[in-house]
Regions:
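Residue-level detector of conserved, function-critical positions
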Residues: 1-290
Length: 290
């Protein structure tokens, strides 16, 4: 199903454009695990693909379902619910996040740790920063440097980088230096540098390609590299995104003159640059604005 907005209310259509769930929500989010988060007023709940309310809009905050559970908040307290809306886990924390690979990130004070699906803290809050697990590892911050832990909490890649991103397709982005002038590259899951820090910006791999920027934020150009760091689509775009279903949306021009189209993994133009706003292809369709 695809989200639509009509007269400030949101709902869903199918691939033929037929309305499946009328636009009756103040805010609707994409379906995850067959349920969609919705908002009415200041409260969140969940609906199924028939539009039936599964969890009434009663929570101040919700994370969305992941691995069958969603973190929710009411009256200043976080807990987890299952897809029937039943409470499954109580947790004492300042913030709770979705489950990934069997563990969920929590924030206690200023530190981050992880709980399991029984609500037991298995990695105690000790990191100044942390993200969700991906491919068996989570990026964490100790002091002012970033590294990775495994599912048992062991530091498997020491915190030596100024920034890192999640592992994707076996590689993780790292940065040496600050956000403005630092250089970016890739490491493998042992911490070995596969692509040295040489680009002005890089993004995680998707479908065997990673988006890179050569040049500064204002004047740089975007292209794509393979997993050895070889440029396979030369930096030529003023903006670009990752690949989805074999296509990536790319743009040339600035401001109101910017137009978006789509290229394949070889950089061949498949859809000419003509749109003012693009989105990823999902199940063969992409939402665009003319």
């Amino acid at each position: 199903l695809y989200k639509i907005r009509v007269e400030r209310k949101e709902g869903f259509i199918n691939k033929t454009g037929a309305v499946v769930i009328p636009s009756s929500f103040d805010k609707a989010y994409n379906f995850k695990e067959d349920l969609a988060k919705i908002k009415n007023g200041s409260r969140y709940g969940f609906i199924n693909k028939s539009g039936k309310t599964v969890v009434p809009a009663q929570y101040a905050k919700v994370s969305g379902f992941s691995e069958g559970l969603s973190a929710v908040k009411n009256d200043g307290k976080w807990f987890y619910i299952d897809k029937t809306g039943a409470k499954t886990i109580d947790v004492v924390c300042n913030f709770a996040y979705p489950f990934h690979e069997g563990l969920a990130r929590i924030q206690v004070g200023t530190l981050f740790g992880f709980i399991n699906t029984s609500g037991i803290i298995v990695i105690k809050p000790q990191f100044e920063g942390a993200y969700d697990f991906s491919e068996g590892k989570a990026r964490v911050k100790k002091g002012d440097k970033w590294g990775f832990i495994d599912l048992k909490g062991a530091l498997v890649i020491k915190p030596t980088y100024d920034f890192v991103r999640d592992f994707s397709e076996g590689l993780a982005v790292f940065r040496v230096g600050n956000e403005r002038t630092g250089k970016w590259g890739f490491i493998d899951n042992t911490g070995k540098v596969i692509v040295k820090a040489q680009f002005d910006k890089v993004f995680p791999f998707s479908e065997g390609r990673a988006l890179v920027r050569v040049g500064d934020f204002k004047n740089g150009k975007f292209g794509y590299v393979d997993k050895m760091g070889k440029i396979v689509v030369k930096p030529q775009f003023d903006s670009a995104y990752h690949f989805s279903e074999g296509l990536a949306n790319v743009a040339v021009g600035v401001g109101s003159d910017r137009k978006w189209g789509y290229v394949d993994v070889a950089g061949k133009v498949v859809v000419a640059k003509q749109f003012s706003k693009p989105s990823d292809f999902i199940n063969g369709l992409a939402l665009v604005r003319i």
